[in-house]
Amino acid sequence: MNRQKNNLIFQYSAVVIFFLIVMFGLSLFLAGHYTPGGGFVGGLLLSSALVIITVAFDIKTMRKIFPWDFKILIGIGLLFCLATPMASWFYNKNFFTHTPFEIPLGILPPMEMHTATFFDLGVMCAVVGTVMTIILSIGENE
């Protein structure tokens, strides 16, 4: 993909749209265990935000903004997906037994989380890594 020229409106709107999609994807990720959403949908939204940045600018610019290798992100995601259900074994519980816990937020009411959130985080990392690896490998071959 070559850098597009004279697309100032598209490039500036892509940056705004990027942040909107990332915020919506993170809210779907955090609400995912109790409502529709979760790691897969959040990962698809995050990778679509990265694809918008890639299309608006180019692959070289996207790699400058996000310098990590997305294949490593797949491995990190799979590690989370494997470690989360196995962690229940250390507490003498059945495989994939999840436990709720609360995160204190100071003056705000505590945020209720679930250990399944870490599994969803692994799914999200694996989805973002897979989608971006496929998109970037297709784009770099042109």
Swiss-Prot record:
Keywords, ordered alphabetically: Antiport, Cell membrane, Hydrogen ion transport, Ion transport, Membrane, Sodium, Sodium transport, Transmembrane, Transmembrane helix, Transport
Gene Ontology annotations of biological process type: proton transmembrane transport; sodium ion transport
GO molecular function: antiporter activity; monoatomic cation transmembrane transporter activity
Superkingdom of origin: Bacteria
Coiled coil location: none
Membrane-spanning segments: 12-32, 37-57, 70-90, 118-138
Subcellular location(s) of the protein: Cell membrane
Primary location: membrane
Recorded family membership: Belongs to the CPA3 antiporters (TC 2.A.63) subunit B family.
Function, as annotated: Mnh complex is a Na(+)/H(+) antiporter involved in Na(+) excretion.
The protein's assembly and partners: May form a heterooligomeric complex that consists of seven subunits: mnhA1, mnhB1, mnhC1, mnhD1, mnhE1, mnhF1 and mnhG1.
Name of the protein: Na(+)/H(+) antiporter subunit B1
Organism: Staphylococcus saprophyticus subsp. saprophyticus (strain ATCC 15305 / DSM 20229 / NCIMB 8711 / NCTC 7292 / S-41)
Gene of this entry: mnhB1
